[in-house]
Amino acid sequence: MLRHASTISENSSVFIKLPSDNVRFVTLKPNNTIHLGKFGSFLADDLFGKHFDETFEIYQPKKIRVLKTREVQYIEEEKKTNQELNDCRGNQLMTQEEIDELRANIKAGGLRAEEAIKQLTNSSKTFEQKTLFAQEKYVTRKGEKYLQRFQVLRPCVEVVANYMIEHDPYKILDLTAECISLMLTLGNVKPGGRYLVVDETGCMFLGSLIDRVAGDCKITLVHPNEQPNSSCLEYWGQDFKEDSLVQKGILKTLNWYQVTNPTETLSEYSVEDIPESELNEMKLRHRKRYETKKATFNRLKNTIDDFESGNYDALFILSIHTPMSVLQHLLPKLGISRPFMVYSTYQQVLVETYHQLSKWDNLFVEKTAQSTENDEKVDQGDVAIDTQKEKVIMLDIHEIRTRPYQVLPERTHPFMTVRGDMGFVLSGIKVLTSDSNLAAGRFPKRKGQKETSSVKKAKLEN
């Protein structure tokens, strides 16, 4: 289990939100100084033991304190408007040199940011003529420039996804937090499950899945390269790194060659057993090399055997490859009545996959041993082979769109600019068909059934 700490500790991975709404990723190492540019700097040791999601203020050079929350003040309506005001540089009486001097004093700790903002408002010609709403807006905008405050955010799906969308959206295939949440919900992700994942988003989705169940799951990751690209896992901390997840038994990795050619792969990595007597006579470096190769082979064999056994609880595909080329190898490994999801930034790709999956079927062979009278060992001839077909049902293509709103008294409205492309998800469920004809409804009774029912009625009357 990967449990989240309630307080900040050494070597914690955190996100720092600045007054300008920009977010920075920082690993808090002991005896280290965190620089926030024009917003100042502070010692990482001062954050240890503090709670996440709190807002801090740099009140002196490299010294911070928790900022107390203030009560929301409701502003009464007024008849004054801003129609007659002109927004120009001449409204500010302070020169640029004086403003630069204010910034230098704030950074040096000789002047508080609140006092500097007050000087700016006092030297503005039009500040008093503005409405109360406009005045608050002006102060807030100046606070984004001068206030030396920051908020420490805990790594989670929303924070990491928004950070990657702002910095490198192509690396994660434009995957948003809303899309991740939808896929986890459709996949019925819960603790204790086994999941098959194809993740080419830098393991952005993989980290979200593990975070959702706090590491209580078994995941097989299929990747196209020699080693998986897990660059996004570091944003959740040291416990989420690939080596740590493999060591804890949460993650197993296979590349496409190992998936499509398991026998050839095992033969390439196979190591002959050496007796203990010969091992004792070997040089130390040769023995270590042999033990490393043997451990690698055993680990790979266990991973391939686990993959070949199939019966996964859900299948998630986030890849740049054609979805059907991936599904034809992995869909047979999915358990019966289990969901699968395919993510793509293009709807047409999923529409073609939708039509191909509607015609898809796979031969399902199940061997069942017939019982004998003496309950003896079942021979090969006593094994019955039940052949059925696997199909997919409930195919659907979901378009992800969210509309954030500004929620304020008498000023609630949607944001004017939002992302227009949030991706598409194809979902479905794999089922097992039956050879017999199934029917439901009310049907007329046969002659034999009518006679039997009449006899039962006569007995009841007697």
Curated annotation (Swiss-Prot):
Its main location: nucleus. GO terms for biological process: tRNA methylation. Keywords: Nucleus, RNA-binding, tRNA processing. Transmembrane segments: none annotated. The gene is gcd10. GO terms for molecular function: tRNA binding. Residues 449-462 have a biased composition (Basic and acidic residues). Heterotetramer; composed of two copies of TRM6 and two copies of TRM61. One of its GO terms (cellular component) is nucleus. It is found in: Nucleus. Substrate-binding subunit of tRNA (adenine-N(1)-)-methyltransferase, which catalyzes the formation of N(1)-methyladenine at position 58 (m1A58) in initiator methionyl-tRNA. Belongs to the TRM6/GCD10 family. The lineage of its organism: Eukaryota, Fungi, Dikarya, Ascomycota, Taphrinomycotina. The keyword RNA-binding applies. Residues 442-462 are annotated as: Disordered. InterPro entries: TRM6. It comes from Schizosaccharomyces pombe (strain 972 / ATCC 24843) (Fission yeast). This is tRNA (adenine(58)-N(1))-methyltransferase non-catalytic subunit trm6.
